[in-house]
Every structure is written in C-alpha cells, then in structure tokens.
Amino acid sequence: MSLFEDLINSKIRELEELKSNLLIDIETRIRKEATAVLNKYSTQITNIESEVALERERILYSAIIEARRKIVETYEQILNDFIETIYNEVDKLRGSERYVKFLRFLIESAINYTQTKDVIIYASPKDRGVVETLAKNLGITGFVIEKDIKGGVIVMTRDGSITVDYSLETLLSNKLEELKHLIYLETHER
C-alpha cells in the first residue's frame, strides 16, 4: 500500500501545488488588472484635474480682463463727464471779467508767438463779440471768424504759415494725461 499511498500523496501534492500556483496566478492577474484600471483612471483623473485647472485659469483671466475693461470704461466716463463739466463751467463764466482776461491772455500769447498783429482769429460764436473787442483794444489788424469750438481762440497769420491753437478743446487735450492722473488719484485715495 505504500506505493499506492505514495502515488496518491504525490498527486495530492501536485494538486495542492497547482492549487497554490493557481491562487498565486489568479491573485497576480487580479493585481495586474487592478493596477491597470487604477493607472487608467489615475491618468483620467490627472487629465481632468489639468483641464479643471486650465478652465479655472481661463475663467480668472477672463474675469480680470472684464474687470479691467470696466475700470477703463469707468475712467473714460469720469474723464468725459469731467471735460463736459469744464465746458459747462466755461459757458457759465462767459462774459465774466475772469473769462475775458483768459481770452486776452490767450490772444496776447498767440500774438507773441506769431510775431505779428495781422492775424485771423477764430472764436466760438458765443465769444465773437468779446474777441472782436479784445482784438481792437490790442491793435490787431486782422479779423475775427466764428468757428465751432467750445471756447478759447485759434490765431493764424494771414498767410496761414503759423497757427496757434488755444481752443478749449486743444488746451484740454494737452492736459488729458494730467487729468487722467488726477482722476486716478481722486478715485484711489478713498
């Protein structure tokens, strides 16, 4: 019986070894498949996280650009309102001694620059009478023509070789950067 038992025991050991190897093989396959699935989903999760981060950055960038655009629009509106206020103040001052002195100063400065009193002076229709009186008092031999300007004067030599633009629009335009800076300071001090 020993031979028979040895044979049976040998087969039992083979089956147990096969069973053990089969369990190890199945466990290895399951681990490989699980690792592959985890890697696949980890890659997908990483890609999704990257997409979310990019989308978040795009949304933030768009929001910053939109905020800056609105700030610029607001500053432009403030500047336009400020300039309109200046034009309205000039309209209120027209005919006052202060405004007449201002026009006289502009005309005298332009005459000094052109080095001649034989000039054409362009003025707002609202200022024409005052400018004609000032020109006469200053001994200017040219004439005054109405022009569509908000205030101030434009003085030109008769031959057109020299033009001095002291219109209110040009004076404000020359001060535009300073006005922007002042508005910026006023709005950021609060």
UniProtKB/Swiss-Prot annotation:
Q: Name one GO molecular function term.
A: proton-transporting ATPase activity, rotational mechanism
Q: Major location, coarse class? A: membrane
Subcellular location(s): the record lists: Cell membrane
What are its GO cellular component terms? plasma membrane; proton-transporting two-sector ATPase complex, catalytic domain
One Pfam match: vATP-synt_E
User: Which cysteine residues pair off into disulfide bonds?
Assistant: none
Question: Where does the source fall among the domains of life?
Answer: Archaea
What's in the keyword line of the UniProt record? ATP synthesis, Cell membrane, Hydrogen ion transport, Ion transport, Membrane, Transport
Q: What's any GO biological process attached to this entry?
A: proton motive force-driven plasma membrane ATP synthesis
In what way does this protein cross or attach to the membrane?
Peripheral membrane protein
Q: How does it assemble?
A: Has multiple subunits with at least A(3), B(3), C, D, E, F, H, I and proteolipid K(x).
Function of the molecule: Component of the A-type ATP synthase that produces ATP from ADP in the presence of a proton gradient across the membrane.
Which HAMAP family does the UniProt record give? ATP_synth_E_arch (MF_00311)
- Give the UniProt family note: Belongs to the V-ATPase E subunit family.
Q: What is this protein called?
A: A-type ATP synthase subunit E
